[in-house]
Amino acid sequence: VWGGDWNQALEGTDYVGTRAGRAAITDLLEASRLSLPTRSLGSATPGHRSIDHIAVPMTWDVLAAWRIPAEVRGRRLSDHDAYVVSIKD
């Protein structure tokens, strides 16, 4: 499992990364046989894709991936949200 703040959206418009960075990460994921269930998830900024990701082995059965807003009573705790991937065990 490889996860964290990659500073790179991997689909849609990329507001912080680069095309070269996106290509390098995509190539590495393929070479490492990792899938990216968080690829299509949004971020704390409406209309933006996540730059935080969780990659898992392609052989894992991913049930779902979702974003948990990092806020309490409308107050942001971080500029990044939390991301979760559920797998079948």
Regions found by a protein language model. Name each.
Residues G3-D5:
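Active-site flanking residues adjacent to catalytic metal/cofactor-binding acidic residues
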Residues Q8-D89:
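Metal-dependent phosphoester-hydrolase catalytic domains
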